[in-house]
């Protein structure tokens, strides 16, 4: 008897564990998110963002042999008790130009849940819940719909999103 795996979905998550004295300046990232949201402009390039992006691409590439290039990046601010609409970072009619992976990074978050929807063959409508914490990332296939819930009632949640193409 033989077995062949035809498809598999991998989710990657954990803390961003930067080398000593190279910590991500989350105050700078949250300021950049605030500025881009208020001014309705693209997220600005910064050394801090580049450190995060380089860390993610290098570590996923080295540990899991998943080589990535950037597609887009933006930041979101979620109000207390806010639940997003279901989010999907692909264009179903243009999959060729859609990203392969979505990364969520907790810039400044408190009691933030992420629900990722997936299908397991004929078992449709499955979901997986994970708490997004400060300095934590969650990366998953962009074909998965997801939403975020800000469960607390006293502060904003800042989340950085980066989409990648698999090469």
Predicted regions and their residues:
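Non-heme Fe(II)/2-oxoglutarate
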Residues: 1-74, 84
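Double-stranded beta-helix
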Residues: 161-167
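Catalytic core of non-heme Fe(II) oxygenases with the double-stranded beta-helix
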Residues: 69, 74-144, 149-151, 156-158
């Amino acid at each position: 008897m033989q077995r062949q795996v035809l498809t598999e979905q991998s989710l990657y998550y954990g803390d961003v564990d930067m080398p000593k004295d190279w910590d991500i300046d989350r105050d700078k990232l949250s300021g950049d998110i605030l500025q881009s949201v208020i001014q309705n402009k693209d997220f600005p390039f910064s050394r801090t963002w580049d450190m995060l992006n380089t860390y993610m691409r290098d570590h996923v590439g080295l540990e899991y042999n998943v080589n990535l290039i950037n597609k887009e990046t933006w930041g979101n601010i979620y109000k207390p008790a806010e639940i997003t609409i279901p989010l999907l970072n692909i264009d179903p009619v243009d999959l060729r130009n859609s990203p392969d992976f979505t990364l969520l990074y907790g810039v400044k978050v408190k009691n933030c849940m992420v629900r990722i929807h997936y299908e397991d063959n004929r078992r449709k409508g499955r979901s997986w819940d994970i708490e997004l914490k400060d300095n934590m990332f969650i990366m998953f296939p962009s074909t998965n719909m997801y939403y975020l819930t800000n469960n607390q009632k006293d502060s904003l949640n800042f989340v950085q999103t980066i989409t990648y193409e698999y090469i």
